[in-house]
Amino acid sequence: MGKNLLEQLRQFTVVVADTGDIQAIETFTPRDSTTNPSLITAAAQMPQYQEIVDSTLLKAKDEAGENASIKDIVRLAFDRLAVAFGLKILQIIPGRVSTEVDARLSYDTEATIAKARYLIGEYAKAGIDKKRILIKIASTWEGIKAAEVLEQEGIHCNLTLLFGLHQAIACAEAKVTLISPFVGRILDWYKKSTGKEYDSHEDPGVQSVTTIYNYYKRFGYKTEVMGASFRNIGEIIELAGCDLLTISPQLLDQLRNTEGDLPRKLDPATVPQDIEKIVMDKATFDKMHAEDPMASEKLAEGIAGFTKALEVLEHLLEERLKVLDGQEHIKHGAEEIFHAYDLDGDGFITREEWAGTDVVFDALDRDHDGKITAAEMSAGLGAAFRLASVG
């Protein structure tokens, strides 16, 4: 019996689990893992993680003091919750976990640096070496400059929401540890813009990551490339050989259950030599960003989506804290999330409205029709996500 695609992929690419579901991580045994507000929101609705949420909230309330507002408590609890899930994940995986800086700080270099130092400090209190943590930051110019400072302090960074070569070059010149170009979201933009369907080998997201990978290898940059946000296993197959790929449990399951040859597509030995080097400064970055409508739109949309996911999670934590305090709980979390994301009130959440993490959208979209209904949501953040995560 031949090897499945997942086994073959692991021969030349580090596989990272794009999930906050600890049981899914145990199932697929990735080296690294990643979390963010929408993943934590989904996991926090699942009964098996309620104890983590409750204990984190109560501890934050205790430490915030009697005069703290509920919003102050919840903000403290969110950072602690991100670290709590990260600590659980680090008990399972041998490598690193990515923990995200508040997306609302994406255009504030100093605030991003301060938040990153705080998160690393929280992990240090639990005895975790900072080498096992990647601080996830949006790839704005300000975020990249924050990462440059943090890397000089030995705090490793994962620059996310990366859609253009200009962002990738700026990250490499800042000597960041890792970047996460978003394959599927690039494809989404081009499909919507052109009305075309793309085969995997001509997928604009695949081509973007290939260009970035070749540029890095051609000029000897040490920054690792981790392809993210996949729509199908065809994209993953075309990027076999990329340094790392972060893959949802659903697609990991498909790879594990598919046999056939998986040739290496990205390889330092076959990188073209006729690539022009670009010196990146802020003026060049801003010019290239303005000239790339896809990167401009998707970066802004991604920050807005991650911000909304954070606000929804904070609201759910507020509601949960009221329950723990014995106050009346007015609405179920899934209902709250549905109304928060159904921006036009038509009774459906599209991928554009969701704008948060793709893995959660895909898990909730149980019939895979590209939209989430209220019924799917209520089935939802526990049952549907669990079903898709563990398979």
Swiss-Prot record:
Subcellular location(s) of the protein: Cytoplasm
Enzyme class: transferase
One GO biological process term: pentose-phosphate shunt
UniProt-listed SUPFAM superfamilies: Aldolase, EF-hand
Active site residues per record: 136
Residues covered by region (Transaldolase): 1-329
Residues reported to bind Ca(2+) 1: 342, 344, 346, 353
Catalytic activity: D-sedoheptulose 7-phosphate + D-glyceraldehyde 3-phosphate = D-erythrose 4-phosphate + beta-D-fructose 6-phosphate
Main location: cytoplasm
Pathway: Carbohydrate degradation; pentose phosphate pathway; D-glyceraldehyde 3-phosphate and beta-D-fructose 6-phosphate from D-ribose 5-phosphate and D-xylulose 5-phosphate (non-oxidative stage): step 2/3
EF-hand domain mapped to chain residues: 329-364, 365-387
Keywords, alphabetical: Calcium, Cytoplasm, Metal-binding, Pentose shunt, Repeat, Schiff base, Transferase
The EC number(s) this enzyme carries: 2.2.1.2
A Pfam cross-reference name: TAL_FSA
Residues of the signal peptide: none
GO molecular function: calcium ion binding; transaldolase activity
Sequence positions that bind Ca(2+) 2: 365, 367, 369, 371, 376
CC annotations in GO: cytoplasm
Family as reported in the entry's similarity comment: Belongs to the transaldolase family. Type 1 subfamily.
Known function: Transaldolase is important for the balance of metabolites in the pentose-phosphate pathway.
HAMAP family registered for this protein in UniProt: Transaldolase_1 (MF_00492)
Protein name in UniProt: Transaldolase
